[in-house]
Amino acid sequence: MYGIEYTTVLFYLISFVFVSYILKTITKIMDYIIYRITFIIVVLSILSNAQNYGINLPITGSMDTTYANSTQNDNFLSSTLCLYYPTEARTQINDNEWKDTLSQLFLTKGWPTGSVYFNEYSNVLEFSIDPKLYCDYNVVLIKFVSGEELDISELADLILNEWLCNPMDITLYYYQQTGEANKWISMGSSCTVKVCPLNTQTLGIGCQTTNVNTFETVADSEKLAIVDVVDSVNHKLDVTSTTCMIRNCNKLGPRENVAIIQVGGSNILDITADPTTSPQTERMMRVNWKKWWQVFYTVVDYINQIVQVMSKRSRSLDSSSFYYRV
């Protein structure tokens, strides 16, 4: 009886050792195969990235035929597009799936699904303060509103250029502009800006520094104002501080990944006459006003022509169109 039990135990022990040996052998073989396959994949992936101009070219016809480089990337496959529109557009369209519809239409123009972002703003003031120009290409739709031409024109100057801005303390200091690129930018729900130029003795020129009613008004009840005064002359300023803020800004140059489409209006607003706009390349265009669906269809149709006058940025910016320095 005891002999049978010992034999059974010995059998299971030998079986366990044998199975363990087989498993270890299989593991070594699998490791060898996996390492080999991984090595081959790495080598092939490196070789496949080379400029293989002759791969899959037919030899049946004339070799003078021009063939496109098969490794060339599509223009927009790795680009992002931000489309900014007023709240009025969404309200009028009144369709919960309208963005999905437009995304599919942009796909027909070479913009992959997920590369186009739709950003809503309520008014010019909100957009000028915090535009969030994140994308490689940024297209802003602004509906022309009679009486707001100046705000729209100055918004265009603001977002089509990069600015470096400092806070201004007009209660303590006088300020002067040092050149054509130096402007004072005020924004708020209602901005009225008055200035009093000063002579070398800090006396008012045509105004009294102690009486703001004698100051010259350079902006009156505007949401956004880019103030330009005589260079190299000190000025005392008066601003409606409760509804407006003002900054001392220098124009650094064009923001070439931004374009503006004016919706409606008899004439396109032109900011290229400004001597500080350099180079004199206008990234503003106009479409007729009918319905917002018609506007978006037009944008989709011409989006690739629009981005041709723009330059893709290698980095995204969220600087409210300015850089703040304190």
UniProtKB/Swiss-Prot annotation:
Posttranslational modification: N-glycosylated. The N-terminus is blocked possibly by pyroglutamic acid.
Alphabetized Pfam families for the sequence: VP7
Alphabetically ordered keywords of this record: Calcium, Capsid protein, Disulfide bond, Glycoprotein, Host endoplasmic reticulum, Host-virus interaction, Metal-binding, Outer capsid protein, Signal, T=13 icosahedral capsid protein, Virion
Disulfide cysteine pairs (residue numbers): C82-C135, C165-C249, C191-C244, C196-C207
Source taxon at top rank: Viruses
Region listing for LVD motif, in residue ranges: 237-239
Function per UniProt: Calcium-binding protein that interacts with rotavirus cell receptors once the initial attachment by VP4 has been achieved. Rotavirus attachment and entry into the host cell probably involves multiple sequential contacts between the outer capsid proteins VP4 and VP7, and the cell receptors. Following entry into the host cell, low intracellular or intravesicular Ca(2+) concentration probably causes the calcium-stabilized VP7 trimers to dissociate from the virion. This step is probably necessary for the membrane-disrupting entry step and the release of VP4, which is locked onto the virion by VP7.
Protein name: Outer capsid glycoprotein VP7
Species assigned in the record: Rotavirus A (isolate RVA/Pig/Australia/BEN144/1989/G4P2B[6])
